C-alpha cells in the first residue's frame, strides 16, 4: 500500500472552509487503486492553519495515474495558490506533497 500526503499551509481561519470543499468528492473515488481519504486539520497552530489530505492507494502507480488523469485536472481547476490575476486571494499559502510506503496497517 501507498500513502500520499498533501500538506497545505493556509491563512488562519480558513481550514474549515477548505475541508468543506472535500465533502463533495470530485471523482477520486473513480480512479482504480484508490482506497481511502482522510482530510485533517492540525490542532493548536499559531499563525496559519494546516490541513493535510491523506490518500491511501493500492500502489504509487495508482496515485500517479490520479495525478495525470482528467479527473484530477477537473477537480483542481478552480484551486488557487496565493492570488490569481483576477485579484481573488486564495487561502492556500503553500503546499507540499509527501509520499509514503505503508509498511504496516491495522484497522479494527
From Swiss-Prot:
Where's the ABM domain?
2-93
**Which residue spans adopt a coiled-coil conformation according to this UniProt entry?**
none
Question: What are the disulphide bonds in this sequence?
Answer: none
**Enzyme class, UniProt record, top EC level:** oxidoreductase
**GO BP terms:** heme catabolic process; iron import into cell
GO terms of molecular function: heme binding; heme oxygenase (decyclizing) activity; iron ion binding
Keywords, in A-Z order: Cytoplasm, Heme, Iron, Metal-binding, Monooxygenase, Oxidoreductase
A Pfam cross-reference name: ABM
Q: Catalysed reaction(s)?
A: heme b + 5 AH2 + 4 O2 + 2 H(+) = delta-staphylobilin + Fe(2+) + formaldehyde + 5 A + 4 H2O; heme b + 5 AH2 + 4 O2 + 2 H(+) = beta-staphylobilin + Fe(2+) + formaldehyde + 5 A + 4 H2O
Q: Where in the cell is it found?
A: Cytoplasm
Q: Major location, coarse class? A: cytoplasm
- InterPro entries noted in UniProt: ABM_dom, Dimeric_a/b-barrel, Heme-degrading_MO, IsdG
EC number in record: 1.14.99.48
Which residues carry the site feature described as Transition state stabilizer?
66
Q: Which domain of life is it from?
A: Bacteria
**What positions does the entry give for Fe cation binding?**
6
What residues does heme bind to? 21-28, 76
- Entry-linked NCBIfam families: PRK13313.1
Q: How does it assemble?
A: Homodimer.
State its role.
Allows bacterial pathogens to use the host heme as an iron source. Catalyzes the oxidative degradation of the heme macrocyclic porphyrin ring to the oxo-bilirubin chromophore staphylobilin (a mixture of the linear tetrapyrroles 5-oxo-delta-bilirubin and 15-oxo-beta-bilirubin) in the presence of a suitable electron donor such as ascorbate or NADPH--cytochrome P450 reductase, with subsequent release of free iron.
Family that this chain belongs to: Belongs to the antibiotic biosynthesis monooxygenase family. Heme-degrading monooxygenase IsdG subfamily.
What is the name attached to this protein's record?
Answer: Heme oxygenase (staphylobilin-producing) 2
